[in-house]
């Protein structure tokens, strides 16, 4: 299930903007309480790059991990043109805080691993090690989620 909400908000630079919340929920969310949420905080232009800053949270049962995440123009362009490689597709971003591993078992649901780099989160050193959050979703829901994120570009 994908949810997109718009809210009016002020960011730390005292600019008023419409906040956009994009949520991807596990197909069994009522039981697993597993989801990832991106809330657009602001957009900044630095050195000819447009950077989209998000407050991001991942939930699993009664646990929640919150962090700031940045997507660059090129990340957004890549999301708009994503192509699936069977059976495994990887989506990486310039900021290595997280990436997606998509596994298509040719069944009703995709298996999405959202991989968090704990080395980067704790020591500002990319390590490609950390926790992964597994979300099972219909391919149409994941495509809608990616399109909602990319539409912010």
Residue ranges and their predicted role:
Residues 2, 6, 10-65:
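N-terminal domain-start interaction segment
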Residues 120-153:
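Mixed-charge, glycine-accented linear interaction segment located at domain edges/termini
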Residues 81-90, 146-153:
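Short, surface-exposed secondary-structure junctions/capping segments
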Residues 49-88:
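Short, well-structured hydrophobic secondary-structure segments
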Residues 87-129:
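Amphipathic protein-protein interaction modules
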Residues 6, 10-11, 25, 103, ...:
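Intrinsic disorder/low-complexity signal
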Residues 32-41, 84, 92-97:
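Charged, amphipathic alpha-helical segments
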Residues 42-44, 58-62, 71-75, 116-120, ...:
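Beta-strand elements of well-folded, non-transmembrane domains
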